[in-house]
Amino acid sequence: MLNLYSEEINLRTIGMNVYYLLRKNLKETLIAQRQDLTYQSILVRSQLSEEYRCEYQREISRLLALGRFTVYPSQEDMTVEVESGFDDSLRLPYVIHKGKHLYFPRKYSVAQAVVAYKGYICGDRLLGKGEDFAPHQYQSKDFQVHDGDVVVDVGCAEALFSLDVIEQASKVYLIERDGIWKTPLLATLAPYKDKAVFVQKLVSDKDSRTTVSLPSLLKCESSSPLFIKMDIEGYEPKVVRTLLPLLREREGITLSCCTYHNNEDAATLEQLFQQVGYRYEFSKGYMLFARYDQPAAPYFRHGVIRASNVTHS
């Protein structure tokens, strides 16, 4: 009887594994189909419209050279040397970023950690001050973290951005719901316990055991200038809406929000910042992104919108 029960559980487990594998494969197939359709649509549109070719000349030229879809058609290739290792006491792989340890989850090998880091630095180009065509870059000359700012990193993942600015910040809130990042995040932040606060919750419009609202979280920072960075898979407009009263009432707020996840995100966020009278800019260059929806014409998307009511001399 026990053997039959065990066999039934094993068969059920195998069935569930097959189901999730097929579901994952189907999802990846749909993404690949959307990417190919987007690439072909851009080629057709560029042949039919000279205005379109001129507006997106940089991106179209690189797509033609590659002969395929790419997330970053604005960017040139870039390489970087990476110092890395494995921490035996923590059992975590790491890379060195500006002399600081940036840890990755235990399921990563050291080689995988290096690949991920190179992706952030060379592929995504998350860091920098907007000097080059890097549509995913969070800061620019006019919208950046200043000494003494309270930084709120919403969707921090490995916390590369926070680690990059932690010396300038007076305090950093790192918000990340995905539990895979908790152990490496705590290791990365260990030298900065006096200024780093990790919040393992989903950002929402209300507070609960699993959610946190930014207005509630930031009540105790009423006198500090804020730099709020968001990369939360298309939920940026929803979260910014919860912030509108705060954005109207307080001085000294700068935001950097991803706009590439969904077709309407850039336009929606632009309208929201216009409502509160913030000056704003989009990052240089465009992205192609087809993970969550089929890109609509003109297909190329702004990567990040930066907005602020701060005036720095």
Predicted stretch roles:
Residues D164, Q168, P184-T188, V239-L246, ...:
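A short acidic, amphipathic alpha-helical/loop segment
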Residues I228, E251-Y260:
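Conserved beta-strand signature within the Rossmann-like core of class I S-adenosyl-L-methionine
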Residues S223-K229:
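Short SAM/SAH-binding signature in class I
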Residues G155, K229-E233:
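Conserved S-adenosyl-L-methionine
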Residues L2-Q168, Y173-I175, D178-S222, A266-A267, ...:
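S-adenosyl-L-methionine
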Residues S204, Y260-N262, G285:
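Active-site beta-loop-alpha junctions enriched in small/polar residues
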